[in-house]
């Protein structure tokens, strides 16, 4: 009998769905990847090349969806009727939260390509600005006055990313909810060692956001941890008049 070739689960998922590169770890670790009908949560699980693999890709089940949803509840922020920018949209977890909470339109901004889920691509309320850096936004790309901004900028510090949004027009009373990733804010490339690192990262992010023309209302710890258990935060701001 010929030897069955096996790969690590993460590698096999990416072989079949390369567009999931930015979310594959989250999908596996949160039980959204099924091998022969059973959820597998170890990235290194060996799977046969011909195994049946199913991936649940509903944004409501993504960790990002839960992060923003719970943060908006804690911060008392309403998205009803807003026209929003979701910077760092990726698969669209934050975008889906905004839509579920009544957003009129969401500009989903993502430097990558092919990540936004098909259901969101087909939603007439979503403007898909993939292959677009936040620094490339203009009033021509985003002609509407923006009343809400959500950010999950990956490896770009908020102090650098948020000022780049100033090329668009903001509506009076516009609000911002920015996810703080300590590794990005501190430039360490490592998970924060203790609470002081998280606090320092959040403080730096808040200072950068304030310098970009926002009044910082509140900072909180994210109620949902990031990949590999990373402690993250949120900054809530309101556009200064």
Regions found by a protein language model. Name each.
Residues 224-241:
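Core SAM-dependent methyltransferase catalytic element
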Residues 172-187:
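Conserved beta-strand signature within the Rossmann-like core of class I S-adenosyl-L-methionine
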Residues 91-102:
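Conserved SAM-binding loop of SAM-dependent methyltransferases across substrates and taxa
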Residues 214-223:
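Conserved S-adenosyl-L-methionine
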Residues 63-82:
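Conserved alpha-helix/loop element of class I SAM-dependent methyltransferases that forms part
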Residues 107-160:
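S-adenosyl-L-methionine
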Residues 1-51:
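A basic, amphipathic helix-loop patch mediating RNA/tRNA/ribosome contacts
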Residues 80-90:
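Conserved class I S-adenosyl-L-methionine
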């Amino acid at each position: 009998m010929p030897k069955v070739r096996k790969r690590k689960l993460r590698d096999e998922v990416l072989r079949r769905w390369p567009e999931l590169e930015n979310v594959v770890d989250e999908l596996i670790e949160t039980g959204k990847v099924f091998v022969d009908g059973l959820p597998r949560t170890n990235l290194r699980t060996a799977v046969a090349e011909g195994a049946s693999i199913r991936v649940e890709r509903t944004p409501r089940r993504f960790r990002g969806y839960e992060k923003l949803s719970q943060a908006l509840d804690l911060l008392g922020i309403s998205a009803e009727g807003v026209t929003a920018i979701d910077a760092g949209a990726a698969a669209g977890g934050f975008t889906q939260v905004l839509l579920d909470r009544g957003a009129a339109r969401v500009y989903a901004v993502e430097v990558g390509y092919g990540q936004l889920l098909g259901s969101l691509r087909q939603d007439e309320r979503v403007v898909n600005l993939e292959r677009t850096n936040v620094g490339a936004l203009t009033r021509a790309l985003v002609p509407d006055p923006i009343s809400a901004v959500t950010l999950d900028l990956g490896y770009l510090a908020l102090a650098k990313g948020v000022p780049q949004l100033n090329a668009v027009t903001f509506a009076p009373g516009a609000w911002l909810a920015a996810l703080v990733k300590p590794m990005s804010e501190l430039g360490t490339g490592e998970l924060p060692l203790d609470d002081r690192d998280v606090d320092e990262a959040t403080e730096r992010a808040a200072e950068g956001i304030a310098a970009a023309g926002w009044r910082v209302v509140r900072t909180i710890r994210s109620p949902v941890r990031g990949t590999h258990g990373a402690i993250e935060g949120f900054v809530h701001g309101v556009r200064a008049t």
